[in-house]
Amino acid sequence: MDLITPDFGIIFWQTITLLFVLFILGKFGWKPILQTLKKRETHIEEALKGAEEAKQLLAQLKSEQEKLLEKSNREREKIISDAVATKNDILETAQMEARQLSDKVLKEAREVINTEKEIAFGKLKHEIFLISVQVAEKLLEKELNTENKQEELVRRLIKETHLN
């Protein structure tokens, strides 16, 4: 047991050595160690502040990105609606022009048909007139082949003209 319990001299010298080591550490070691710890603590705080600022910046950028996305979506919808409106206007204009052209062509066709119809009726009347004259000529030749009949017709025509 003697080996386990230290002597008074050993305790004394160990205490002196410990105090000397503490003095040396206090004089030369603690200040650099504390400064290093302080620097590390400051560095960690700055890193945390930087991380927080980065987080805020990221949130701000995300918010701006969402706003830009919304704006671009609105612009896209506006462009699409404008394009649809323009398409509808163009289609409506084209349909109206097609209708006008169709009406114009129909009107011209009707005019041509009416003109040709009038020409055909004129030719038909002329043909009927010529046929009537030929028939009348043939009838008159048959009826007026004698001189008595010719004189009788002339007298009758004179009487009718005086009466009218």
From Swiss-Prot:
GO terms for cellular component: plasma membrane; proton-transporting ATP synthase complex. InterPro entries: ATP_synth_B-like_membr_sf, ATP_synth_b/b'su_bac/chlpt, ATP_synth_F0_bsu_bac, ATP_synthase_B_chain. CDD domains: ATP-synt_Fo_b. The keyword S-adenosyl-L-methionine does not apply. It holds the Pfam family ATP-synt_B. It is a single-pass membrane protein. The keyword Lipid biosynthesis does not apply. Keywords: ATP synthesis, Cell membrane, CF(0), Hydrogen ion transport, Ion transport, Membrane, Transmembrane, Transmembrane helix, Transport. SUPFAM superfamilies: F1F0 ATP synthase subunit B, membrane domain. F(1)F(0) ATP synthase produces ATP from ADP in the presence of a proton or sodium gradient. F-type ATPases consist of two structural domains, F(1) containing the extramembraneous catalytic core and F(0) containing the membrane proton channel, linked together by a central stalk and a peripheral stalk. During catalysis, ATP synthesis in the catalytic domain of F(1) is coupled via a rotary mechanism of the central stalk subunits to proton translocation. Belongs to the ATPase B chain family. F-type ATPases have 2 components, F(1) - the catalytic core - and F(0) - the membrane proton channel. F(1) has five subunits: alpha(3), beta(3), gamma(1), delta(1), epsilon(1). F(0) has three main subunits: a(1), b(2) and c(10-14). The alpha and beta chains form an alternating ring which encloses part of the gamma chain. F(1) is attached to F(0) by a central stalk formed by the gamma and epsilon chains, while a peripheral stalk is formed by the delta and b chains. This is ATP synthase subunit b. It comes from Amoebophilus asiaticus (strain 5a2).
